[in-house]
Amino acid sequence: GLQQHANYFIHLYLDLTPETIDSQYVHLAQFIHPNAHIEFKKQLAEHEKVVKKLHLSSRFDIKHLTTNVAKQTVTLSGRLVFYQGPSPQGAKDKTFVMQFSNKLGKPFILKIAEGNNENK
């Protein structure tokens, strides 16, 4: 359940290009919990502005995934690789925490936040 959803959503959130970001974020927004919509839209708009302005692409390679069912969170650690056009611009080890809330049996995203990166 949660792991598959987190895996799918993190790729919509981070595996993007200036050409795909609009459709990916529209799709992702359908899975945002109504209570988190306003804050999340701001977060997505900021990402979109940077990606389009600098013509950046990114890819997130998951190395480790941990689920906390009680808290409805999934922690994803991995390597975020940046490109400008076809040229690699660097990579960073990153950790993201996704928090979910079930609504009518469907998981909705409450939050995607950068977490502490213990797995370097």
Tell me the role of every PLM-derived stretch:
Residues G1-H11:
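Short, low-complexity N-terminal intrinsically disordered segments enriched in polar/charged residues
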Residues Q4, L14, E19-K120:
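Structured, amphipathic secondary-structure segments that form assembly/contact surfaces
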